[in-house]
C-alpha cells in the first residue's frame, strides 16, 4: 500500500510506521483518507489513526506534539478542535512541505469512525478486528430537510457580505455552501 505513494509521502509514512512500531505505547497504526479512497497524488495529505494502549493514552495525548516532532522536521502543529476533533493533531513538516494528520485514539474509540482504515501495523490483530467488527464506519450525513432549513439563511448571509463589499467573506460563505450543501 505505501509503495504506491509519491516518494516524499512514502518515505514519511515508512519512517512513521517504524517509529511507532518501536514505541510500546502504540497498539496499532491505521491509515485513512485518500490512501484508502484513491486519488492520492503529490499534493495529498497523509491521514493516520494512532491507536494507543489505554494505559498510556493520557501520557501520549499530553506529549503528542513532542512525539510528532520526532517524526521529521515539524514546522507547526495544532489540534483539531475547530473541526470538532480534539484528538486530531494537524501537522506541517518541511522543508519539502507535507501535511500530516495524526488522530490519537484507543481501541475502544474505534467504534466511532467515518471510514474503514487500512492497518499499517498492529500488535494484536485479533483485538483490533474484534473492536472493528463491533460497528461499521458511518459518515454523519444530514437529511435533505436539515440542509433545506438552513439554505436560505446561509445564502442570505453570503448576499449580505457581498452587499457590504466583503468579498472574501462572501466567497468563504459560498465555498462553505458548496462543501456542506452541494457536496
Which ranges hold each PLM region?
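Short gly/ser/thr-rich secondary-structure transition/capping motifs
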Residues: 31-33
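Metal-dependent nucleotidyltransferase catalytic core
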Residues: 1-24, 35-37, 50-102
Amino acid at each position: 500500500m505505501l509503495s504506491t505513494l509519491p516518494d516524499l509521502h512514502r518515505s514519511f509514512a515508512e519512517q512513521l510506521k517504524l517509529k511507532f512500531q518501536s514505541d510500546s505505547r502504540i497498539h496499532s497504526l491505521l491509515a485513512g483518507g485518500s490512501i484508502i479512497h484513491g486519488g492520492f497524488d503529490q499534493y495529498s495529505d497523509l491521514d493516520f489513526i494512532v491507536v494507543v494502549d489505554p494505559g498510556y493514552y493520557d501520557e501520549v495525548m499530553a506529549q503528542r506534539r513532542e512525539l510528532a516532532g520526532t517524526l521529521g522536521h515539524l514546522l507547526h502543529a495544532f489540534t483539531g478542535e475547530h473541526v470538532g476533533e480534539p484528538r486530531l493533531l494537524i501537522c506541517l513538516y518541511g522543508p519539502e512541505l507535507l501535511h500530516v494528520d495524526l488522530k490519537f485514539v484507543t481501541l475502544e474509540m474505534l467504534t466511532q469512525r467515518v471510514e474503514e482504515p487500512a492497518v499499517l501495523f498492529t500488535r494484536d490483530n485479533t483485538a483490533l478486528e474484534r473492536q472493528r467488527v463491533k460497528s461499521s464506519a458511518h459518515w454523519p450525513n444530514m437529511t435533505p430537510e436539515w440542509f433545506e432549513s438552513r439554505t436560505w439563511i446561509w445564502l442570505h448571509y453570503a448576499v449580505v457580505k457581498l452587499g457590504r463589499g466583503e468579498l472574501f467573506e462572501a466567497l468563504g460563505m459560498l465555498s462553505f455552501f458548496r462543501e456542506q450543501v452541494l457536496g
